[in-house]
Amino acid sequence: MMLRKLLLGLAVLPALVTSTQAPANQSDKAAQGLKNVTVLIVRHAEKPDQGTGLSPRGEQRAEAYAHYFNPLQLGGKNLVPQRLIATSDSKSSARPRLTLTPLSQRLHIPIEQPYADEEVDKLVKSLGKKNQASVVLIAWHHGHIDNLIEAFGGDGQALTGQKSWPEDVYNWLIVLRFDDQGQLVESHSQKVQEHLLPGDGS
């Protein structure tokens, strides 16, 4: 009887080991698309008092991005986005797409707009599974950027030094770096102050 119980216990053991390992394996698989990836996040460029587009200064920033990100010189490396992602257009704003349009034309790569502002979890999950680009540039609305950073595993307040993204700030670049396991390396992530237009950094 004792022998029979021992054999049954040994038979159950592999199943227990497999079940305890499954979440880790699934987690690794979910982050595959972010292995050794750099994610760049900007707020859309300046907006006018009315309308869905950019202000004249916003158009200048969008044009400046076409050069700033081709290539972005950061930490002794030249980074060129291989994917451009913007919030989907809405009735009130097409600004994230318009912010990336000059860069898109210069790099000859399309702007992807699969998700709305609040769908940050879906965006991050999609990148974790399917992304093959080593550098991804995302343009989003400022009210949702902290949530986007959090979805990637970061802390927006710690990165920006603010409780929330300020209403009048358009010249911050968020840099998120991921390791060879697809996990965010917060110590290597940063906020960069752009100096593209007069008044930037003041």
Language-model regions: role of each:
Residues 1-10:
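Bacterial N-terminal signal peptides that target proteins for export
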Residues 2-3, 119, 141:
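Alpha-helix initiation/capping motif
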Residues 17-18, 57:
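Residues in and immediately flanking transmembrane alpha helices
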Residues 20-24:
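Sec/Tat signal peptide C-region and signal peptidase I cleavage site
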Residues 25-133, 144-202:
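Active-site-proximal alpha-helix that buttresses catalytic centers in soluble enzyme cores
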Residues 135-139:
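Periplasmic-binding protein-like
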